[in-house]
Amino acid sequence: MARIAGVNIPDNKHTVISLTYIYGVGRTTAQAICAATGVNPAAKIKDLSDEQIEQLRGEVAKLTTEGDLRREVNMKIKRLMDLGCYRGLRHRRGLPVRGQRTKTNARTRKGPRKPIRK
């Protein structure tokens, strides 16, 4: 297994699919990385040379991925909560943030049902 950005990349999958195992790299970004490095997106990781894998590492290193991206997202959510804006309040209360209905549904965000005490 090749290791890129601290993630073990599967050898037996296509390059584009393997790169999506990195947090912050989706299909579109993976295709852009392959185009920038000149690596065939349909080639499997085990068939790539060490030089090509180094090129992929270099391109991925230019992006914000893994721990840095997770930290950045958490800091943005924390900033909203500190501001006290509507989105921050929804995050703080553990409710849907983007305007979804909550009378029914929203169980994933709200958690399991709590019994009504009489």
Swiss-Prot record:
GO MF annotations in UniProt: rRNA binding; structural constituent of ribosome; tRNA binding
Nucleotidyltransferase found in the keyword field: no
PROSITE patterns per the UniProt record, alphabetical: RIBOSOMAL_S13_1, RIBOSOMAL_S13_2
Pfam families the record matches: Ribosomal_S13
Ranges where the record places region Disordered: 93-118
A GO cellular-component term linked to this record: cytosol
Classification via InterPro entries: Rbsml_uS13_C (IPR027437), Ribosomal_uS13 (IPR001892), Ribosomal_uS13-like_H2TH (IPR010979), Ribosomal_uS13_bac-type (IPR019980), Ribosomal_uS13_CS (IPR018269)
Keywords carried by this UniProt record: Ribonucleoprotein, Ribosomal protein, RNA-binding, rRNA-binding, tRNA-binding
GO biological process: translation
Summary of the function given for this chain in its UniProt record: Located at the top of the head of the 30S subunit, it contacts several helices of the 16S rRNA. In the 70S ribosome it contacts the 23S rRNA (bridge B1a) and protein L5 of the 50S subunit (bridge B1b), connecting the 2 subunits; these bridges are implicated in subunit movement. Contacts the tRNAs in the A and P-sites.
Classification via HAMAP family: Ribosomal_uS13
Family: Belongs to the universal ribosomal protein uS13 family.
Subunit structure: Part of the 30S ribosomal subunit. Forms a loose heterodimer with protein S19. Forms two bridges to the 50S subunit in the 70S ribosome.
Name of the protein this chain belongs to: Small ribosomal subunit protein uS13
Organism, scientific name: Azotobacter vinelandii (strain DJ / ATCC BAA-1303)
